[in-house]
Swiss-Prot record:
Keywords: Developmental protein, DNA damage, DNA recombination, DNA repair, DNA-binding, Metal-binding, Nucleus, Repeat, Repressor, Transcription, Transcription regulation, Zinc, Zinc-finger. The gene is pho. This is Polycomb protein PHO. The keyword DNA repair applies. One of its GO terms (cellular component) is chromatin. GO terms for molecular function: chromatin binding; chromatin DNA binding; DNA binding; DNA-binding transcription factor activity, RNA polymerase II-specific; RNA polymerase II cis-regulatory region sequence-specific DNA binding; sequence-specific DNA binding; zinc ion binding. Polycomb group (PcG) protein that binds to the 5'-CNGCCATNNNNG-3' sequence found in the regulatory regions of many genes. PcG proteins act by forming multiprotein complexes, which are required to maintain the transcriptionally repressive state of homeotic genes throughout development. PcG proteins are not required to initiate repression, but to maintain it during later stages of development. They probably act via the methylation of histones, rendering chromatin heritably changed in its expressibility. Probably targets the Esc/E(z) complex to DNA. It comes from Drosophila melanogaster. Its main location: nucleus.
Length: 520
């Protein structure tokens, strides 16, 4: 009985028994079956070609060995699980020397085709042959010819891509439609093949998609909400508004602060004293006698800083009559007469809540707001136990002695970092002063009108102010002495040279050294 299995017409008497035996765990070893029938087929071909001569037989034997070496072994196991689903396990794919033996296969095909023609003409066909191979033309159940060809098929799986050589029939669909087939076996085999490759691939794709979706969900990051630039600008504007409010409050406090004078201060009419420093600035525009005892009023304008200050007047070799200054609270301006020398170096201008705690050390007239500041200052009057071995200078603190010793050792640990300079200094103060040469910073400004000169060091500013005083002395009118009334006093004030000392309190400077400016 002829039947078709795996796309090949076979004839076997045991086919009925094979159809009846449909067990769930049926195992088919196709590889061994394939090799056995292929060997028998080639033996038949070689036997049929023996009549053409020994050369053809030897050639076929030689080509047979090459084809066996280059054969692609495709073995698969078809399993039927309890759920009646089939799985196809590809054991191995071997493709050895397919390109090298392609020409050999063509030569063998031509020789076999000639054999087919001779066989058809003689009418001798061995129906007991279980397998007919490459290039063999046979008759199916309807007597139509069929040609088997070898094709290269690409199979893609989850693990990789493989190339498999499979056998295919060269018959057309029209010729094949009229043939009688065993539907049960062909459909069963077709279903197994489709499920084995396509079904397995689709199932693996679905599982892969599920795993990918789970991985994607697991890797999803929760990003915070973006911060708007408008919110940032609002926050900055709000902070800036708070700072401006604080500045306005401080300015209002300074503008409303009234100054009380303990003793009268006489300023010349042309005096315009202005202190410009890194931390404080003060301008006094008053052309009258300032006294809170004589009924005269005094004004201080443009006070932009809350730094405490002191104003003292030093009279240098001037014998003027200052009848307008009275030491008594009930004396009148016209009652005071006479001439004399007066020392106004201790006259101060202070706030109402000025420092009240005085330094107890003899000869020190400094005052402080609290006792802790006074005790800190009192330490400077302590015993100078740290003495320099080189020059004999004594210091209260050891840090001051170490700084002084740098002068003798010549060590200069402070170096200028500007490119191309590299100068070194023994004191950090000198380095800061030197850096102003590179930066161009000049914080010390001349306080006189029409003179806007700036200096990097305070000593240079002091020397410059003395030039203004000398110039005024040279151009002033001298020779006026003696006074009897307020008019003579005002004239003597215009011609006199009074030096004004403006100094900041201890809390201003870093080393508690007052900053002093002398002005005419």
């Amino acid at each position: 009985m002829a039947y078709e299995r795996f796309g090949i017409i076979l004839q076997s008497e045991q086919y009925d028994e094979d159809i009846g035996n449909t067990k769930v765990n049926q195992k088919m070893n196709e590889g061994n079956h394939y090799d056995l029938h292929r060997k028998n087929a080639f033996d038949r071909i070689i036997h049929s070609e023996s009549k053409k001569g020994d050369n053809v037989i030897n050639y076929n034997i030689h080509e047979n060995d090459k084809i066996k070496a280059a054969d692609n072994i495709f073995s698969s196991k078809l399993k039927m699980n309890p759920n009646m689903s089939y799985e196809m396990n590809i054991n191995c794919f071997k493709n050895i020397g397919y390109g090298e033996n392609q020409e050999t296969s063509k030569v063998l095909t031509n020789s076999l085709s000639n054999n087919d023609i001779n066989t058809e003409e003689s009418g001798v066909v061995d129906k007991n042959s279980p397998f007919l191979t490459l290039g063999t033309t046979i008759l199916n159940s309807n007597g139509k010819s069929r040609r088997w060809e070898q094709k290269l098929v690409h199979i893609k799986t989850m693990e990789g891509e493989f190339s498999v050589t499979m056998w295919a029939s060269g018959i057309s669909d029209d010729e094949y439609s009229g043939s009688d087939q065993i539907v049960g076996a062909s459909d069963l085999l077709k279903g197994k093949e489709e499920f084995g490759i396509d079904g397995f691939t689709s199932q693996q794709n679905k599982e892969y998609q599920k795993m990918e979706s789970k991985f994607t969900n697991a890797q999803t990051l929760e990003m915070p909400h973006p911060i708007s630039s408008v919110q940032i600008m609002d926050h900055l504007i709000k902070e800036r508004g708070n700072l401006s409010q604080e500045n306005n409050i401080s300015e209002r406090i300074l503008s409303k602060t009234t100054l009380s004078f303990e003793e009268p201060i006489l300023l010349p009419d042309s005096s315009s004293i202005e202190l410009v420093n890194e931390t404080a600035a003060m301008t006094i525009n008053n052309h009258r006698t300032l006294s809170n005892h004589t009924g005269n009023t005094g004004d201080l304008h443009a006070l932009p800083s809350s730094v405490p200050f002191r104003i003292g007047l030093h009279e240098g070799q001037v014998n003027d009559c200052l009848s307008t200054i009275s030491q008594s609270t009930h004396q009148d301006n016209t009652d005071s007469t006479g001439c004399g020398e007066m020392n106004l170096s201790e006259v101060t201008v202070s706030y109402t809540n000025d420092k009240k705690i005085a330094c107890p050390h003899k000869g020190c007239n400094k005052h402080f707001r609290d006792s802790s500041a006074m005790r800190k200052h009192l330490h400077t009057h302590g015993p100078r136990v740290h003495v320099c071995a080189e020059c004999g200078k004594a210091f209260v603190e050891s840090s001051k002695l170490k700084r002084h010793q740098l002068v003798h050792t010549g060590e200069k640990p402070f170096q200028c970092t500007f490119e191309g300079c590299g100068k070194r200094f023994s004191l950090d103060f000198n380095l800061r002063t030197h850096v102003r040469i590179h930066t161009g910073d000049r914080p010390f400004v001349c306080p006189f009108d029409a003179c806007n000169k700036k200096f990097a060091q305070s000593t240079n500013l002091k020397s410059h102010i003395l030039t203004h005083a000398k110039a005024k002395r040279n151009t002033s009118i001298s020779g006026k002495s003696g006074c009897s009334n307020a008019e003579s006093n005002s004239q003597s004030e215009d011609t006199s040279a009074n030096y004004v000392k403006v100094e900041l309190q201890d809390s201003v400077t870093e080393n508690h050294v007052p900053f002093v400016v002398y002005a005419d």
